[in-house]
Amino acid sequence: MITASGGGDTGALRAPGEAPVDVRPQAAAPDEEAGPGGGPAPSRGGSFLARAALVTAALSVAGSLLGLARDQALAHFFGAGTDTDAFLVAWTVPEMAATLLIEDGLAFFLVPAFSLALAQRGRGTGRDPVRALVAASLPRMCLCFAAAALVLALAAPWVVAALAPGLPDQRLAVDCTRLTATCALSFGLAGYCSAALRAHQRYTVPATIYVVYNAAIIATLALLAARWGVRAAAAGVAVGGALMVVAQVPSLVRQLRSGRGTGGSPAPAEPPSTRLRTTVIWTVLLFALCRQSQVLIERFLASSLPGGAISHLNYAQKVAQMPMALALMLCTVTFPVLARAQAEGQTLKARDRVERDVVMAGCVVLLGAAAVIAGAHPIIQLLFERGAFTPEDTAATASVMRVYSLGLLGHTLVGALARSYFAGGRVTWAPVTAMGLGIVATAGLGVLSVGTFGVYGIAASNAIGICLTATLLLRGMGPRTVPIRIPKVVAELAGLVLAAAVATLLGALCARSLTAPVPALLACGPTVLLTFVLVGWSLRVGPLVSAVSALGPALRKLASRHDR
């Protein structure tokens, strides 16, 4: 039901008598600059993007660490048993809502829409197109979000039965689902604010939302876990979702008030195709829904396994996905820049941006995957083995995490490449088709393997399915999207994969030589990092060559300061 939040006819988003707001890219003068009155943000250079990426990375890491603390609290209070499984079925709702409404679906449509409106604002004629877009879309989207939340709450028993038919305590899962259903509204509003702020090149406030969200869940668990049980975690989701909106609204209001506009009638515009804009929304939301349906498949298959299987898979994914989240953070920062380049017809700039983003994201995620696979057991032992979380849970979760991590590069490439397909605001069914084929592969392989390999078969099916999708998306990059140089990108990614494989092997040998988790990680981490950088540098992989080249002058400068 969440897809109803954005799937209607966008012609209905216009107030009576208003001119339509086109979200398709149009050519704009390349020399447009922002005026002091709040026109489109001027073209930002690499230093601005680097600072924005650094701040966003710091806040993303803080949010991820709080996410780990949230999972630690959940493991401490409830372990990896049937109560946790019941909550994790309800947790599917905020997971899907985050993908559809914050991270992928809504952002893939709204960031290009706001980027185009900002480009039109620079012409300084007629009504402010940014305010027109907000007035046309936000009220009706709010109604859609609220309706989706209400339907989810009322349909909770059927949702739980469909997601996990083999779950022992379905009543507890229903209670948790009704509490988490509120995020269909709160996440929708948070995603709207986040997309608008990022299009204005305001990154700090949107990057704080998961810090606020996870802190709220932890606080609610601490206050209510003894009385409400695992329902306290679901209540924390509801509170955290509301706080994500509250954190962003003041900043968005300031951006809208600073916008330049004459306040007159809108300038005449070429009537856009409402059908086209509606199709754009559907392609974006269907892609995001297909991508998130991997979680539904995993939970469905794992519900028939012994108690704790869903929890082991969940904890493994939460840790393994941290490198992916950090890698895609860069793409989140540069997505508005890519959308603006597409809107202004700057194809070469868009191509270079995509190539850099894909290789850099691959570099970050493969380094993280190498560390996660090599140090899986001590990582899980250090993070979760306390309270009701037993050594057997540690061993099972670490093993699943190693298998799941094999698909991290695929997950990252899908996230990075999908932004390239949707940045222009054009209709494209390629991402949906590729994701659909990947989902079919995931489901088919999962059904065939779960009986024999259990949760490991589910994790392996996930990795294979997402890698198939990534391959199809990469092959589909061409003139209708962003015409990147595929052989060049593949060659650099292959070098990074080889570097990660060598680093994983050496890191695992170091980790296994020590039994205590902290010494094992202190030996494993630097080994993985050093090996990855040296092997990648020897293979002349771009980001690592640049990193090593920059390291020499930095060390010499530091040494000269020390000599003084």
PLM segments and residue spans:
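Interhelical loop/hinge segments that connect adjacent transmembrane helices in multipass membrane
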Residues: D9-R14, E18-L49, A247-R291, G308, ...
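Short membrane-interface helical motifs at transmembrane helix boundaries
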Residues: A148-P168, A370-P391, V447, L509
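Alpha-helical transmembrane segments of multi-pass membrane proteins
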Residues: L154-W158, L167-C193, F389-L417
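Membrane-proximal transmembrane or re-entrant/amphipathic helices at the cytosolic face
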Residues: I2-P25, P30-D31, A511-R564
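Helix-loop junctions and terminal segments of transmembrane helices
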Residues: E103-G122, L328-T347, A418
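Hydrophobic alpha-helical transmembrane segments
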Residues: I209-R254, L437-T442, V455-G476, T527
